Amino acid sequence: MSRFACSRRTLLRLIATSAAAIASPVIAQDAARAKTLKLVVPFPPGGSTDLLARIMGPRLAQRLGETVVIENKAGAGGNIGASLVAAEPASANTVMFAATSVIINPTIQAGNSPFQIFRDLVPVTRLVDIPCAILVGPSVNAASLGELIALAKSRPGGLNMASAGFGTIPHVAGELLKSLSGGAFTHVPHKGQAEMLRELIGGRTDVAVDLLAGSLQHIESGRLRALAVTSTRRQEALPGVPTAEEAGLKGYVVSAHQSMWAPGSTPRGRLDQLNRVVAEVMREPEVLQAISKMMMTPATGPVDEAEKYLRAEVSRWAQVVPAGSAAQ
């Protein structure tokens, strides 16, 4: 039984328990006087960002004494939801859970983004980090990262590298792999992670760098092979798989992340309050258990630390992926 399958059942139980637990302290408030926090998820229901929001939402409500309403505003790689939050006034009491792609897309869109990161949207806190792995499908004759790179250099036309779309972690991490290895990899974007994995498993593409949260079940089943993990140390779920640096690709460290953002006009006092409450929720044993099963690790810290880290991430990927790439 895969760890991912177990995690889905655990998460569903946790979400159900959370909904029941929240009923007394928050819903008991007078509806006319209760403050509502709108938590926007810029992706469809069921993904890792959505599940994290539904685990944390009821607990945030309990600690804040507010009603938390989760709204999925999917589309354009997260830009639709992010644009809506960026346009909200501080009085709207709105926040967003965002994946890496949402914060790096405005930079690589070369001025085509409807909002400016760090001006129209400001970070509240980092939430979790998610390790990735370099994956190959059954049609690729490579047993190690070194063999994969050698194959990409020797095969006429190189190898096809799948992604979940422009600006996603599989895209930018793939571009970094191409840059550091010198291998010939051709980017093949897909409409989301599910399609990307389906094409990779089917042998219609050759390689992908993907979040372990979504690909671990396919590695465990043997449908995909992990040649390396992209973290600084080996992953407990895949102890026999080396890190990319151990496999000889120095400097190749990639981690996806989830973070909380608020409209740029949000007062600093409110940012600090939300930051503190999120950190408290993230320390709860049930939350730690659930995110661990999703291959996530807590990454909360002060507001200023979050901004410093996220600015560095935007700068890093802007150097890897040319401006305007997302519009190609």
Q: Can you say where each PLM-predicted feature lies in the sequence?
A:
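Short loop/turn segments at beta->alpha junctions
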Residues: 7, 77, 144, 189-192, ...
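An extracytoplasmic/periplasmic, membrane-proximal ligand-sensing/linker region
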Residues: 34-36, 180, 268-328
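Beta->alpha turn/N-cap motifs
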Residues: 97-102, 163-164, 193, 210-215, ...
